[in-house]
């Protein structure tokens, strides 16, 4: 698979809840400068006030980032992130990777990986554990599975 011309650190995080905000802050400290999106303007403002970059939509984030990390609650929200009217898949380029941090049914994950592969997008199933404090400290646990190419591409963010 041919990778796009995004810099290897072009990473975005969708969902700045307890875990996502801490992950975004940890990536900034590591020098990766993630772009972020959240439906709550106040939490997005909190991140940008600390020097972070926000996108106005999920679609914009998908167009900017080679690595898109979704930190939303469940499969239903992830479906919206991926395929909704402003979803990221329409804007993601072939060779990008979608990292899904929600806990979902394995069959859902397998189906989603196949659908993304049809678009040339790699997929990692990466549920997370550890809580907000550990996320903020860059110490969460990710239980990651997927194609080795997807893992290699996302490795700087994991």
Question: Can you annotate each of these PLM segments?
Answer:
Residues 58-123:
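Rossmann-fold NAD(P) dinucleotide-binding segment
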Residues 1-71, 96, 132-135:
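NAD(P)+-binding Rossmann beta1-loop-alpha1 motif at the extreme N-terminus of oxidoreductases
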Residues 23, 43, 57, 77, ...:
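Hydrophobic alpha-helical segments typical of transmembrane helices
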Residues 24-26, 48, 80-83, 110-113, ...:
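Short amphipathic alpha-helical segments
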Residues 37, 71, 102, 144-145:
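Active-site-adjacent beta-strand anchor residues
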Residues 11, 103-158:
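Rossmann-fold dinucleotide-binding core
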Residues 40, 74, 147:
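A generic "binding-loop/recognition-motif" signal
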């Amino acid at each position: 698979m041919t990778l796009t011309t995004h810099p290897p650190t072009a990473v975005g995080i969708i969902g700045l809840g307890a875990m996502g905000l801490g992950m975004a802050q940890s990536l900034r400290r590591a020098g990766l400068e993630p772009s972020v999106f959240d439906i709550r303007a106040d939490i997005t403002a909190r991140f940008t006030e600390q020097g972070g970059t926000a996108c106005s939509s999920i679609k914009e984030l998908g167009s900017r980032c080679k690595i898109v990390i979704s930190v939303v609650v469940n499969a239903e929200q992830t479906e919206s992130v991926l395929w909704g009217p402003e979803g990221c898949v329409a804007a993601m380029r072939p060779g990008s990777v979608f990292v899904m941090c929600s806990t979902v049914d394995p069959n859902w994950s397998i189906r989603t990986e196949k659908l993304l592969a049809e678009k040339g997008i790699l997929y990692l199933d990466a549920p997370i554990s550890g809580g907000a404090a550990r996320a903020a400290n860059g110490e969460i646990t990710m239980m990651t599975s997927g194609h080795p190419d997807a893992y290699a591409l996302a490795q700087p963010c994991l």
